Amino acid sequence: MGLLTVTGTPLPDPNDLDEDGDDAVRRSAGVGESSRASRHWWDRNADEYQDEHGEFLGDDRFTWCPEGLDEADARLLGDLAGRTVLEIGAGAAQCSRWLAARGARPVALDISYRQLQHSRRIDLARGAAPVPVVQADAAVLPFADAAFDLACSAYGAVPFSADTSALMREVHRVLRPGGRWVFSVTHPIRWAFPDEPGVEGLTAVSSYFDRTPYVEEDEQGHATYVEHHRTIGDRVRELVAAGFRLVDLVEPEWPEGHEQDWGGWSPLRGRLIPGTAIFVAERG
């Protein structure tokens, strides 16, 4: 499969990486620009992300969303023992470790080398066999046809890809017939609201139907972060066009007793409007 070996050398100092500005605009952003921005942003911010969210994510927890829905309870992937699983946008491969502990054979893919270094760091600290990892763009998967039984992504890759139709086709290509593809994204309705956890995040200020990307730029106007919006209907049509059958669409409710904010996700907003959409599809 062309698996990438990530060394156990110390992680580079974040101060050695370029500092990008964060002026936010709404404008078009193509495939190449989006991919470059995503790779650079995650390389630059992986340390902070893992430090801030590492306790919630754990080293080997499979959680689908800030609402805290775990695969152990949801069982959206079905039977795992002996199944080959591709985790897309894996970050530090926490989900893949959970899958491996249940008898699956996962491969963790991410566009960010720095995120994959964190995966290696966790493996070394645990003294466990390393999770196989691959650095690649999710829209150009470096695997043979029908290489996997299952594919999954917990908030990884899909929102950052400019051409998610191509991404869906690639996932379809590498899955075996009947293979399940499950991915979670920010619920599309959230696009209409400010990304704020408080009351200011409860008033719609943008059109749900405006698909213009959200782009953060540096002083030269180069994209440093890009996120793409699709409506629920867009996602369904992408899946069907790629050859999938939609099995379920899960909108996790905010659970009682869960009081932890995650960016714009909060108990206040989560109890009023959905924050996550999980698409469950099967390859035809």
Locate the predicted segments by residue:
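Conserved class I S-adenosyl-L-methionine
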Residues: 2-81, 94-95, 180-215
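Class I SAM-dependent methyltransferase SAM/SAH-binding core
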Residues: 84-140
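A short acidic, Gly/Pro-enriched loop at the edge of an enzyme's catalytic core
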Residues: 139-150
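A short SAM/SAH-binding and catalytic strip from SAM-dependent methyltransferases
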Residues: 149-165
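A short glycine-rich, Lys/Arg-flanked "PGG" loop and its adjoining helix->strand segment in the class I
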Residues: 165-180
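Short alpha-helix
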Residues: 215, 226-249
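C-terminal lobe and adjacent flexible extensions of AdoMet/dcAdoMet transferase-like proteins
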Residues: 238-284
